[in-house]
């Protein structure tokens, strides 16, 4: 389970689509009682993101300069250590930096032990980088489709395989149609992100938590009495702007949409 308000599953196409360098969908899972602010332009900062009001950080964000970042937590129920720095500040640190994505990741690697386990993607218009402080050195990503949840990207859980299949076989073909209604596109995103299909027990990962909890967390969309998918996101970078739709999935604002368009600075 998340302790920092991080994303819990993300799929994106990087320089796969014409005139759309980045197309990303994701779910943020969190305890319902943990306070957070929805997607917004941060005051006196270049960041557009939601915000974890407990730690002050965020799970995913962009800037008008074309920088973007997203973090998922690396789940390890056996790790009982206390860490001095919140993973939620990684996004803000990158978005407010002028460093190239690979350089930022390489510098972060020097003090990565200060954080609980994470998967981190940082990028701009030309370069995307992945790293994990639990066994994946910073690597520049080739053009392609990437999916990660709460294990290493190289582990490829059945949960991530299922999302990759739906993202590549159902969603990307819609995007590649010459004429597609925005409503149809967005409906396809929510249908994929609200998938409650569970993985059968023998195919579950072992992350140091109970089998019952592994099963609960094995679906793209999670619901339980105290923890679950708090919001879903559909983010696109075109040649001249960001288009971001966030859907609140739990609580009093359930079903509420926030849609932002952020022009890119040349």
Predicted regions located by residue number:
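N-terminal nucleophile
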Residues: 2-266
């Amino acid at each position: 389970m998340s302790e920092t308000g991080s994303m819990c599953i993300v799929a994106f196409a990087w320089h796969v689509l014409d005139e759309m360098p980045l197309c990303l969908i994701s779910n943020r899972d969190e305890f319902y009682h943990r306070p957070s602010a929805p997607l917004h332009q941060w005051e006196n900062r270049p960041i557009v993101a939601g915000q974890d009001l407990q730690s002050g950080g965020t799970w995913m964000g962009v800037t008008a300069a074309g920088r973007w970042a997203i973090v998922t937590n690396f789940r390890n129920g056996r790790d009982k250590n206390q860490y001095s720095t919140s993973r939620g500040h990684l996004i803000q640190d990158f978005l407010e930096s002028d460093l190239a994505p690979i350089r930022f990741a390489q510098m972060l690697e020097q003090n990565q032990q200060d954080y609980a386990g994470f998967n981190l993607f940082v990028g701009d218009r030309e370069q995307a980088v992945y790293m994990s402080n639990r066994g994946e050195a910073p690597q520049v990503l080739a053009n392609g489709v990437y999916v990660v949840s709460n294990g290493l990207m190289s582990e490829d859980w059945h949960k991530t395989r299922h999302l990759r299949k739906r993202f590549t076989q159902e969603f990307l073909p819609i995007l590649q149609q010459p004429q597609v209604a925005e409503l149809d596109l967005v409906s396809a995103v929510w249908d994929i992100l609200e998938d409650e299909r569970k993985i059968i027990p023998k195919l579950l990962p072992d992350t140091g938590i109970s089998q019952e909890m592994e099963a609960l967390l094995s679906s793209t969309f999670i619901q339980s009495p105290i923890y679950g998918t708090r919001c879903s996101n559909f983010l696109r970078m075109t040649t001249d702007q960001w288009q971001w739709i966030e859907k609140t999935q739990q609580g009093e604002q359930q079903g509420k949409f926030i849609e932002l368009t952020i022009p890119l600075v040349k």
